[in-house]
């Protein structure tokens, strides 16, 4: 993992943005850290009270993200899918990721993809934002969703004012 090309871990001024976070209960040690980092990222961006809900697993994220998207300006889905000995990993990772993308496209609400798809628990721990992790995917997915919500807010306000986007 290089993180090459990743933007700086910046914050955006997202005061007034309503954020929903849906997180899996599978691989709780990893996902709990991602939730904590997502909440911290939201607060650093001015979103003081994000809605946080927990779901059974990664496959439940899209339907809950869809519901959150109806009442929030941005949504983040968080999970850790760890490869096992069967192809189940492939199906879960693809379905959950595609589901979050479909929610964003169908609703026009940005959905940050914080689904870790890792070959091992060690890889997941290295990406979940713990103090000794190399990456912080909960933070990154949250800032990305908030940033996109701000872009959409600006584009929509321009359109409402009759200005070109």
UniProtKB/Swiss-Prot annotation:
Gene3D superfamilies on file: Lumazine/riboflavin synthase
CDD domains: Lumazine_synthase-I (cd09209)
Keywords on record: Riboflavin biosynthesis, Transferase
Residue positions binding (2S)-2-hydroxy-3-oxobutyl phosphate: 85-86, 127
Active site (record annotation): 88
Entries under Pfam families matching the protein: DMRL_synthase
Alphabetized GO MF terms: 6,7-dimethyl-8-ribityllumazine synthase activity
GO annotation, cellular component aspect: cytosol; riboflavin synthase complex
Reaction catalysed by this enzyme: (2S)-2-hydroxy-3-oxobutyl phosphate + 5-amino-6-(D-ribitylamino)uracil = 6,7-dimethyl-8-(1-D-ribityl)lumazine + phosphate + 2 H2O + H(+)
Known pathway: Cofactor biosynthesis; riboflavin biosynthesis; riboflavin from 2-hydroxy-3-oxobutyl phosphate and 5-amino-6-(D-ribitylamino)uracil: step 1/2
Residue positions binding 5-amino-6-(D-ribitylamino)uracil: 26, 58-60, 80-82, 113
Entry keyword annotation includes Transferase: yes
Top-level taxonomic group: Bacteria
InterPro entries the UniProt entry points to: LS (IPR034964), LS/RS (IPR002180), LS/RS_sf (IPR036467)
BP GO terms, sorted: riboflavin biosynthetic process
EC nos: 2.5.1.78
PANTHER family assigned: 6,7-DIMETHYL-8-RIBITYLLUMAZINE SYNTHASE, 6,7-DIMETHYL-8-RIBITYLLUMAZINE SYNTHASE DMRL SYNTHASE LUMAZINE SYNTHASE
Family: Belongs to the DMRL synthase family.
Function field: Catalyzes the formation of 6,7-dimethyl-8-ribityllumazine by condensation of 5-amino-6-(D-ribitylamino)uracil with 3,4-dihydroxy-2-butanone 4-phosphate. This is the penultimate step in the biosynthesis of riboflavin.
Annotated protein name in UniProt: 6,7-dimethyl-8-ribityllumazine synthase
Gene: ribH
């Amino acid at each position: 993992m290089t993180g090459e090309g990743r933007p700086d871990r910046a914050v955006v001024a997202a005061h007034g943005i309503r954020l929903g976070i849906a997180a899996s209960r599978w691989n709780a040690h990893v996902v709990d850290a991602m939730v904590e980092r997502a909440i911290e990222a939201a607060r650093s961006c001015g979103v003081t009270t994000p809605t946080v809900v927990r779901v059974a697993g990664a496959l439940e994220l899209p339907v809950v993200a869809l519901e959150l998207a109806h009442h929030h300006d941005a949504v983040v889905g968080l999970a850790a899918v760890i490869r096992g000995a069967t192809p189940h990993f492939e199906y879960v990772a693809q379905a959950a990721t595609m589901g979050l993308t479909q929610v964003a496209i169908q609703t026009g609400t940005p959905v940050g993809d914080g689904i870790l798809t890792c070959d091992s628990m060690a890889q997941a721990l290295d990406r979940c934002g713990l103090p000794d992790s190399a990456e912080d995917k909960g933070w990154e997915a949250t800032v990305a969703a908030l940033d996109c919500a701000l872009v959409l807010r600006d584009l929509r306000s321009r359109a409402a004012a009759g200005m070109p986007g």
